[in-house]
Amino acid sequence: MAKQPKRMQKWTGDVAATHALDEAVKLVKANANAKFDETVEIAVNLGVDPRHADQQVRGVVALPSGTGRDVRVAVIAKDAKAEEAKAAGAEVVGAEDLVERIQGGFMDFDRVIATPDMMALVGRLGKVLGPRGLMPNPRVGTVTPNVGQAVKDAKGGSIEFRVEKAGIVHAGIGKASFTEEQLTANVKAMVDALNKAKPSGAKGTYVKKVSLSSTMGPGFKIDVASLGV
């Protein structure tokens, strides 16, 4: 028999089975056996073709239980808005100087927020931030005059999501140390946000498959009906 990968050795059940949401959460927690606090990840297969402009799915969701991770925020702003960002807890704040640092390879942040007046500057960073999914965008609230609130949202559990080429959305929605109730609430919030972001061009079944896993654990398929969608 072929040797199972390490992340599958603990689970001997039927990998093709589907589970109600609460049962899937229990299984993910029970199989998160690494020596670190594993991230719990959701994968949602959507009935969209991202190659078409009218089938793009992108947005932001405030997870009610937070993410369990320390989010480092960079803000591109100046004067009073720069001070507002610092007061809200942004780790890195700057204008032309910060743009030049990022162009030079500085990437010690998880989220980039910018004020609208800085977008001409930020445009220089498209090739650097775009492929990493970090480019500020007004559609997800990372281009805004309200930088203080945006920083607080990012640090308080607000995450961005975007459909990938295969029509799948991946996101970290908590830690294995979270309670079952916390993880369940975050999953429901994520699926609700995806439903609200349903594009006009989506036809047929929108939420097709949902699975939940931890960083080193197996994936468990969730019965979509148990999500109320």
Curated annotation (Swiss-Prot):
Gene3D superfamilies membership: 3.30.190.20, 3.40.50.790
Short name of any one Pfam family annotated for the protein: Ribosomal_L1
Assigned keywords, A-Z: Repressor, Ribonucleoprotein, Ribosomal protein, RNA-binding, rRNA-binding, Translation regulation, tRNA-binding
Biological process according to GO: regulation of translation; translation
UniProt function note: Binds directly to 23S rRNA. The L1 stalk is quite mobile in the ribosome, and is involved in E site tRNA release. Protein L1 is also a translational repressor protein, it controls the translation of the L11 operon by binding to its mRNA.
Gene (UniProt): rplA
Family of this protein: Belongs to the universal ribosomal protein uL1 family.
Cited InterPro entries: Ribosom_uL1_bac-type (IPR005878), Ribosomal_uL1 (IPR002143), Ribosomal_uL1-like (IPR023674), Ribosomal_uL1/biogenesis (IPR028364), Ribosomal_uL1_3-a/b-sand (IPR016095), Ribosomal_uL1_CS (IPR023673)
Subunit structure: Part of the 50S ribosomal subunit.
Gene Ontology CC entries for this record: cytosolic large ribosomal subunit
Origin species: Phenylobacterium zucineum (strain HLK1)
Official protein name in the record: Large ribosomal subunit protein uL1
GO molecular function list: rRNA binding; structural constituent of ribosome; tRNA binding
